[in-house]
A protein has these predicted regions:
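N-terminal alpha-helical interaction modules that lie
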Residues: 1-54, 102-166
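Primarily a tetratricopeptide repeat
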Residues: 13, 20, 57, 61, ...
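Canonical positions in the second alpha-helix
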Residues: 25-28, 62-65, 99
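Start-of-helix signal in alpha-solenoid helical-repeat scaffolds, especially tetratricopeptide repeats
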Residues: 36, 73-74
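TPR/TPR-like alpha-solenoid signature
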Residues: 40, 77-79
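Short coil/turn linking the two alpha-helices of tandem helical-hairpin repeats
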Residues: 50, 70, 85-88, 119-120
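Duplex nucleic acid-engaging cores and interfaces of nucleic-acid transaction enzymes
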Residues: 68, 75
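TPR/TPR-like (Sel1-like) alpha-helical repeat modules
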Residues: 83-108, 135-137
Length: 166
């Protein structure tokens, strides 16, 4: 099964299935453990469908259900785009900073369109390469020129420069 289907009908079906499965976990166990990571896929799926409102609703639900969850890089990338699109630039910038703190390579890949040189110490940053490679190309393509220009200003900010130097 592909991570993200291509056809809108299939995307809607995947969204419904994941939402049903998450609700089923909640109903049966009183909590959501979600070992597969469906909670990270719903926002990107809504965005791929062109449903910014649905994506925003998902992220609000996510924040309420998983307040301590740091998210996955592709999840944070899409969350920041949704917030940017609805005019919440400060919150969107916060998500981009969280993305850089979690993975220093996703945002440069978005901005340059090229795979950055991975100069990390795998032992010091376990999972960072895997998470970087785990972001599907379709999610980078969601960003238009205006959003990319805004993301570049966030990337060049003193706060993000400090995060990148760690």
């Amino acid at each position: 099964m592909d991570l993200f289907p291509q056809e809108p009908r299939q995307i809607r079906e995947r969204i419904r299935r994941y939402e049903r499965l998450l609700q089923k976990e909640m109903d049966e166990f009183g909590q959501i453990s979600d070992g597969y990571g469906k909670r990270y896929l719903l926002g990107p799926l809504y965005l791929l469908l062109g449903d910014t409102t649905g994506a925003l609703s998902h992220y609000e639900w996510f924040e309420a259900m998983f307040p301590g969850d740091r998210g996955h890089p592709m999840h944070l990338l899409c969350w920041s785009l949704v917030l940017y699109r609805v005019g919440q630039q400060a919150a969107a910038a916060t998500r981009l900073r969280q993305l850089v703190a979690a993975n220093r390579y996703v945002l440069p890949r978005l901005l340059s369109g090229e795979t950055p040189v991975l100069d990390l110490d795998v032992e010091a940053h376990p999972g960072e390469v895997f998470d970087f490679e785990d972001v599907p190309i379709e999610l980078y393509a969601l960003w238009d020129e205006e959003a990319l220009a805004w993301a570049q200003t966030v990337y060049d900010s003193p706060e993000v420069r400090q995060l990148r130097s760690k």
